[in-house]
Design a protein with these regions (language model features):
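Bacterial N-terminal signal peptides that target proteins for export
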Residues: 1-10
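Bacterial N-terminal signal peptides
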Residues: 10-18
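Hydrophobic-core positions in well-structured secondary-structure elements of globular domains
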Residues: 23-350
Length: 350
């Protein structure tokens, strides 16, 4: 069964802001498409802010003006030019950026910077020739690792939304022997057995928002819906009660995306500069203890030479959306729609 039939929407937001940010004015999200570029993974969808970080520096430091193409500018470029996400919405210890003329010296700066800050090596910088041609490279890495306040127990593997294969889940049931688990979870709203959202809290101040919905809408519309519904749930029970149930699937995937629609088009006012390559990677994992996110992005430009017992059930075993944000920020840096089990961690066959 495809991912669309399994998860109609998953938004994972790590936002550096408190939950009060969800009640902020939602009209900003409706005016522009702010989760760009959004990437299809089968019938699932993922967004992370890393490419926007790279684009911001490409626009501000290299082109030094809004990017326009001589042969016509696509909508994606106009949306990126608005810079709806920036490094000011992230803590300094969660990202690394570098830009400059393409050279072995810049490559070494990136390698040393990543190792010093994250103890990481890049998976993409060796994909280009650093010695040929005139041009520029803009690079960024976003990295997050987080642990829940308490680790959740794992439940027996089960299918996701009718899929033919079982996936792993963690959960809280009404007979849990660890009452501290409830401190991991805030209820944002519960409107019905098919419309609810929760927030998972972490030791590092990251917030994972899980929204159960079948709506096939944009991340902007989905996040706006969470904010509006949470604001209206002022009378509801905000804590997970002893009769409430929670079930969340493990998530694990690694993908690379290329944005060919941005490439090989001369940029206005640059004497022939064009984007030669625009790429982004996403690695994401979520399990019963916490999770991790690592994403790289790079733009290379070149000069032309030419429910139970009355309790509620918060089960994320059907289409859902996931957002990730820092607790003191009001913009997410990661979003994910899960429609099937393609991105979920499978049970090994014995």
């Amino acid at each position: 069964m495809n991912l669309k039939k399994i998860l109609s929407a998953i938004l994972v937001l790590f936002l550096a802001c408190s939950i009060t940010s969800l009640s902020a004015d939602a009209r900003w999200f409706e005016k522009y498409s702010s989760f760009v570029p959004s990437n299809a993974v089968g019938e699932n969808e993922v967004w992370v802010g890393t490419f926007q970080l790279v684009w911001n520096d490409f626009q501000d430091k290299i082109v030094k003006a809004p990017v326009k193409f001589e042969e016509g500018t696509p909508k994606l470029v106009d949306e990126l030019n608005r810079q709806p996400f920036s490094s000011s919405m992230l803590s300094d210890n969660s990202y690394f950026k570098a830009y400059g003329e393409k050279s072995l010296e810049l490559k070494e700066e990136i390698e040393n910077g990543l190792m010093e800050k994250f103890g990481e090596k890049s998976a993409i910088i060796d994909s280009i020739d650093w010695t040929s041609g005139q041009g520029y490279v803009v690079y960024a890495m976003l990295k997050k690792e987080f642990k829940y306040l308490s680790a959740f127990p794992e439940i027996e593997a089960a299918p996701f939304y009718g899929s033919g294969e079982s996936v792993r889940y963690f959960w809280i049931d009404k007979n849990t022997s660890n009452p501290t688990l409830y401190q991991n979870v805030d209820v944002l709203f519960y409107n019905s057995a098919n419309s609810y959202a929760i927030k998972l809290k972490t030791k590092e101040g990251e917030e994972i928002i899980l929204y159960r919905t079948d709506d096939n809408k944009s991340f902007d519309d989905l996040y706006s819906a969470v904010m509006k519904k949470q604001k209206r749930f002022w009378f509801g029970k905000k804590e997970l009660g002893e009769q409430d149930l929670l079930k969340v699937p493990y998530i694990k995937f690694s993908k690379q995306f290329s944005y060919d629609e941005l490439c090989n088009k001369k940029i206005v006012g640059t004497n022939g500069l064009f984007i030669d390559k625009a790429i982004q990677t996403v690695e994401f994992g979520l399990d019963n203890q916490g999770g991790n996110l690592k994403s790289e992005a790079m733009v290379i430009s070149t000069m032309s030479l030419i429910r139970r017992d009355g309790g509620r059930e918060f089960f994320f075993d059907k289409p859902f959306v996931l957002f990730m944000k820092e607790a003191n920020q009001d913009r997410p840096y990661f979003a994910l729609k899960v429609k099937n089990s393609d991105l979920l961690e499978k049970v090994s066959k014995q």
